[in-house]
Amino acid sequence: MRIVLAYSGGLDTSVILKLMQEKLGAEVITVTVDVGQKDDFEKIEEKAYKFGAVKHYYIDAKEEFAENYVCKAIKANALYENAYPLSTALARPLIVEKLVEVAKKEGAGIIAHGCTGKGNDQVRFNLGIKALMPEAEILQPVAEWNLTRDWEMEYAKKHGIPVSDKIYSIDENIWGRSIEGGVLEDPSIEPPEEVFEWTVSIEKAPDKPEYVTIGFENGVPVSLNGEKMKLLELILKLNEIAGKHGVGRIDHIEDRSVGIKSREVYEAPAAVTLIKAHQDLEKLTLTKWVIEFKSIVDSKWSWLVYNGLWYEPLRLALEGFIDEAEKAVNGEVTVKLWKGNAIVVGRKSDNALYDVKMATYEKFSTFDQKLAKGFIELFGMQSVLAYNMLHGVHSTSNISEIKEAIKTLE
């Protein structure tokens, strides 16, 4: 029996690695996918072999993650429940893809992961595996074998598995960092400063603001302060720049896929800055009808990704609309980073629908104001008539005008 295990090197997956050998007599192949987490990958590989893995794969997928996943999220202004930029959720389909590739290569019929039965990741992993490799058996030991934290820690001590004294559970990649556990489970308590690594507090942020200019092509960031660069590099640089100004801290109540409400704390400096800049450029370059409808599409796209439905055909259909709309989203946006805020202060585009000659109140305006009166009459006609009907309001002037018109016809 060969099993491919998504391996982080943490307590859960290290305990699972040993247990699958003991309980099932399995040969376990471990896979670690690098999506930008700040881990010691050499130590993770050492641990994998130490605890019995017959083979270990380290896969650097950072650039693929940026170009094929984060890119889509930016174009979709992806914020689940208007807050969470989907950092963890976006990475799961890519990790699943790599697990399936290894399983097929190694002839393994079982894919295992360390997800609990309470979180969203079990949905994302299981649905993804079933979509890409329907014949695979999915093993979820923490949930299926009802492993508790206390039991795992006791087992780890007996088998020489290092037990971290960290209070918080961390998941990170280039797009964001999520923090769970400890006092954060009480939503009434402010997150202590110790939980944050990517961002400084507002109190410690510089008093002087910093300005960044982000260039977009077809809705995708392609330059920072006039320098062309790949999306991965741009995100990493912006995480550092925006983070030092306290931008990107998120603390909100989130509805999980399994029906639980949870308090979630994130750091996402680049994500917050880029999405804000992108949305502003859309306002400059898209019609109000496209913007209005796209907000619905974006929200649904975010919901699908959050809930593990990456392989749902609706996602691709929504992306068809998004990609068409984004053809016009080209230009530059200047953002002021200051004391936890990312404030758009300037934008320009060759595709701008803003015309200063139309918008100005100065004498060189080209807008014919006389047209407004007739427009207003037509625009609000049904609303005014409905109000009058419901409230018994009748215009005698209108009646007189109608009578005069009838006489003219006679």
Swiss-Prot record:
Subunit structure comment from the entry: Homotetramer.
Keywords: Amino-acid biosynthesis, Arginine biosynthesis, ATP-binding, Cytoplasm, Ligase, Nucleotide-binding
InterPro entries named among the record's database cross-references: Arginosuc_syn_C, Arginosuc_syn_N, Arginosuc_synth, Arginosuc_synth_CS, Arginosuc_synth_type_1_subfam, AS_cat/multimer_dom_body, Rossmann-like_a/b/a_fold
Major localization class: cytoplasm
Gene designation: argG
Entry-linked CDD domains: ASS
Record-linked Gene3D superfamilies: Argininosuccinate synthetase, chain A, domain 2, HUPs, Single helix bin
GO MF, any single term: ATP binding
Binding site for L-aspartate: 116, 120-121
Designated name of the protein: Argininosuccinate synthase
Cellular localisation: Cytoplasm
Organism of origin: Pyrococcus furiosus (strain ATCC 43587 / DSM 3638 / JCM 8422 / Vc1)
EC numbers for this chain: 6.3.4.5
Family listed: Belongs to the argininosuccinate synthase family. Type 1 subfamily.
